[in-house]
């Protein structure tokens, strides 16, 4: 059985196609009590690694707060999480690996992304420009037009709010993309 590490995966949305197909999915998230900076070596061969680290220090939607986050240490903490995630890649040398984050300043630390997409490129009718870094096969697109559900745009903008629940909903991997990624990277 192939093992997939799914880091920063509270919802399980991105790893769901792998789990449904019978893969051994090791899902890790701080909200499940696992801080990847303190995760010990797993004595198993890892086939692939999915990584969706928190975007709050990097996303362009929060650019007005970047200076404050740089000054108070939140950016350093966020970069440390990226470093810890990439340590898994070096440790396990998987067949493929991918790190996801919305458009923002993460490219300052990781360089140019490997791929960029919107959920509507993979069958989910909304936009949220997302970047991917890593070594993986680019998923086959299944484009649909985005639906505008409010004057701000998609349901993502309509959510608003800063509660944990709305943040979780905004950060969930779109199911169309998750399935397309699985199909391209079995």
Segments from the language model and where they lie:
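Conserved active-site and SAM-binding loop architecture
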Residues: 1-186
């Amino acid at each position: 059985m192939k093992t997939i590490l799914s880091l920063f995966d509270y919802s399980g949305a991105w790893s769901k196609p792998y789990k449904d197909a019978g893969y051994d999915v090791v899902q890790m998230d701080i909200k499940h009590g696992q801080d990847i900076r303190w995760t010990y070596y797993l004595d198993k061969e890892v086939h692939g690694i999915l990584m969706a680290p928190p975007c709050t220090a990097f996303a362009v939607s929060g650019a007005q707060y970047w200076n404050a986050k740089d000054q108070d240490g939140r950016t350093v903490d966020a970069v440390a999480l990226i470093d810890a995630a990439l340590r898994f890649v070096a440790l396990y040398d998987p067949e493929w690996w991918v790190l996801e984050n919305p458009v923002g300043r993460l490219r300052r630390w990781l360089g140019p992304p490997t791929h960029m997409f919107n959920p509507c490129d993979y069958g989910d009718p909304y936009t949220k420009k997302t970047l991917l870094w890593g070594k993986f096969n680019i998923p086959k697109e299944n484009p649909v037009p985005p639906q505008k559900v409010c004057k701000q745009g998609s349901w993502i903008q309509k959510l608003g709010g800063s509660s944990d629940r709305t943040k979780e909903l905004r950060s969930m991997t779109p199911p169309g993309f998750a399935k397309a990624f699985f199909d391209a990277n079995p």
